[in-house]
Amino acid sequence: MSYLIPGELIPEDGFIELNKGRETTTLKVANTSDRPIQIGSHYHFFESNKGLEFDRKKSLGKRLDIPAGTAIRFEPGDQREVNLVPYAGDRKIFGFNGLINNSLQQ
């Protein structure tokens, strides 16, 4: 007899492919500030800390292509490439740094 543990997850065998078939954008990002900057998986990358230097136009409506609930940390002086994926669904961007607060469909 097997016993279930409250909250236990029993996944199927195999791998889960994240953002399968989604278009990605690769950007070179540099932390030009004197402090570490961390960006979460679903943060609107366009509105990230001004201490990060990258092509912001290419990041509009996109988030990091990393597993949900994780983040990327940029130490002062760090430079690396990141992959971004477009937001899905209604593509409404509200909050963050308040730069958009509207639908991207317009």
UniProtKB/Swiss-Prot annotation:
GO CC annotations, alphabetized: urease complex
Keywords: Cytoplasm, Hydrolase
Reactions catalysed, as given in the entry: urea + 2 H2O + H(+) = hydrogencarbonate + 2 NH4(+)
InterPro entries linked to this entry: Urease_beta-like, Urease_betasu_sf, Urease_subunit
Compartment annotation: Cytoplasm
GO molecular function: urease activity
Top-level enzyme category: hydrolase
Major localization listed first in the record, in broad terms: cytoplasm
Gene3D superfamilies: Urease, beta subunit
EC id: 3.5.1.5
Biological processes annotated in GO: urea catabolic process
Pathway linked to the protein: Nitrogen metabolism; urea degradation; CO(2) and NH(3) from urea (urease route): step 1/1
Assembly with partners or alone: Heterotrimer of UreA (gamma), UreB (beta) and UreC (alpha) subunits. Three heterotrimers associate to form the active enzyme.
Family: Belongs to the urease beta subunit family.
PANTHER family: UREASE
Name of the molecule in the record: Urease subunit beta
Organism: Prochlorococcus marinus (strain NATL2A)
Protein's gene: ureB
